[in-house]
């Protein structure tokens, strides 16, 4: 029997000014999609800047198990260049073994979309956190194509997916804003004859649509009579291999960015950060609170907007964060709550119900951790209310992260500005999205260490 991997507790102490120019790892959302669409394209796709975290590697292994050939070459500076030789739309092979997606919720849900319209059977599983996350909101629309799913109660993994040999085109209105649900339906539509349409009342990140277009799929955007966005995909295209330059992940950039805002006299530049309009809610919110964030050299790379961010330490003021902003920053609320704890005045973050079904119940985890660190915080339904005093938080707590990478990184940032050190009980999950986080932060001057 393989012995369990021991926890890796990390501790952050109050920091002196942070400084430097860094590039955080590649965007996780785009990395998953690049591997999947490269695996369905005809020819060889070259990917630079791929996030080499555990979640994305799980997707790479899954695509290999279904016939794609994936290889990594290392450049002189140690960066990885990935190549994917695709099998063509409709060419996925039935995997010989269970597909273990680890902690990759995005990878698992998007993969279900691909599997749903291929004539094969596959079994998906994951780690304890992923096995506890609901999948029904993805499997319900995918069943409309003709696929069937057998999982644990509540539609949880492990789950057997039986793809249909005769998929039917679908028109699906997304009931709750979710880029993962939208993307799973569009990916299922790739191997479906005719037109598949997703109706989206509230806009969510559009990485899937951008990358489908980059690989040559025919997409049509419009509006219905209620003002909702309609995305129509023509099925069974021949996707063409295309080079992909993955921008730095704005959700990962959020942690050094907020640290630079909060640690006095800091000055940090983050290079090549993805600036997709549906991903910059945190930047907009921090600037409203008073953060000094300059957007330098805006540009387009592989269909995605990118820029460098120059960040200086700033005094923040509490604000109201509307529910409508949640889709553009759903992963950034834990670190925004840390910023709010250091601001002067009250910050109310509305519409956070989605946080309850992430890698952990993030809403409860954030509130519990902040309270343990001496912050005045309350939860009112789906609203998180943080009463900042404009002073240094007490800190001094050990925070249970429950295998949630973003909770872990958020509270390490809090430790950099707290009177007493903050400890997280286990930092292993950070590698799922941000390998090298501690090394990068210590390079800026942050006192974060293994204990």
From Swiss-Prot:
One of its GO terms (cellular component) is cytoplasm. It catalyses: 3-phosphoshikimate + phosphoenolpyruvate = 5-O-(1-carboxyvinyl)-3-phosphoshikimate + phosphate. Pathway: Metabolic intermediate biosynthesis; chorismate biosynthesis; chorismate from D-erythrose 4-phosphate and phosphoenolpyruvate: step 6/7. The keyword Transferase applies. It holds the Pfam family EPSP_synthase. The active site is at residue 331. 3-phosphoshikimate binds at residues 28-29, 33, 178, 180, 331, 358. Its EC number is 2.5.1.19. Phosphoenolpyruvate binds at residues 28, 105, 133, 180, 362, 406. It is found in: Cytoplasm. InterPro entries: Enolpyruvate_Tfrase_dom, Enolpyruvate_Tfrase_sf, EPSP_synthase, EPSP_synthase_CS, RNA3'P_cycl/enolpyr_Trfase_a/b. This is 3-phosphoshikimate 1-carboxyvinyltransferase. One of its GO terms (biological process) is aromatic amino acid family biosynthetic process.
